[in-house]
Every structure is written in C-alpha cells, then in structure tokens.
Amino acid sequence: VLTAEDRRLLQASVGKLGCRLEDIGADALNRLLIVFPQSKTYFSHFNLSPGSKDIVHQGEKVGKALDSALKHLDDIRGTLSQLSDLHAYNLRVDPVNFQLLSKCLHVSLATHLRNEYNASTCLAWDKFLEQVADVLCEKYR
C-alpha cells in the first residue's frame, strides 16, 4: 500500500526526471530486450535493434500507462483494466515479464534521477511498480 509519503516521492521524482515517462518506458523496454532476451518472443514482428522506432513506440506506450496509473493512484486497477485484459487474453504475456520490466524501469529511473533516486524514492517506485504488475497479472488467475 502506498503511503502519503510514497505518493509524494513518486510525484516529486516524476517532476525531477527532466524527460517524459514515455522516454523512461522506451529506455526500460530497450534494456528489457537486451538483458532478458527471452522477452523478445512477444515482439517478433518488431525491428528489435536497440533504439528502433518500434521499440521506442512500444516503450512510449509503457510510459503512458505508468503516467496514467500515477495520475490515478487510488484506482490503478480501474485505470489499467483494459491493459490487463489485453495482456492476459490477447497477447498472453508471461506474467514474469512484468517483474522483469519493473527491474529495467528501476535502472532507467536511477539513471535519469541519479542522486535523487535514493532508498526512499526507490522503495516508493518499487511499491508502485509492484501494484502495477499485480493489476496486470490478476486476470491470469
């Protein structure tokens, strides 16, 4: 459960990013495909070259979904419901990939925020990303 302090830290860190969450999503997706190559199976129709237009576009979708969830912290489930349906019923993404992407998002955030990505901020993002992953996985049950 996100505390008031977690929410404050999330909002503050987004304000300090110096880029859009869409850029963070694109960077994290690039990292995911390099570090966890098994995730490439879901993107066989994409140009998987690092920084390709396909990867950037898909990563921007990740960032937009996170941005939307951050704007609706009291209703992450409702906000991401359609995305959860898409991943569970249509794309059939292995749920472990949400955790792997979360790890890559942490690295991307830390890279952009540097010293601002301290233990408290990291914990707030970890709680948030765990909630997002839980929502995206719940339709698999």
Swiss-Prot record:
One of its GO terms (cellular component) is haptoglobin-hemoglobin complex. Red blood cells. Residues 1-141 form the Globin domain. SUPFAM superfamilies: Globin-like (SSF46458). GO terms for biological process: hydrogen peroxide catabolic process. GO terms for molecular function: haptoglobin binding; heme binding; metal ion binding; organic acid binding; oxygen binding; oxygen carrier activity; peroxidase activity. It comes from the Eukaryota. Heterotetramer of two alpha chains and two beta chains. This is Hemoglobin subunit alpha-D. It comes from Drymarchon melanurus erebennus. The lineage of its organism: Eukaryota, Metazoa, Chordata, Craniata, Vertebrata.
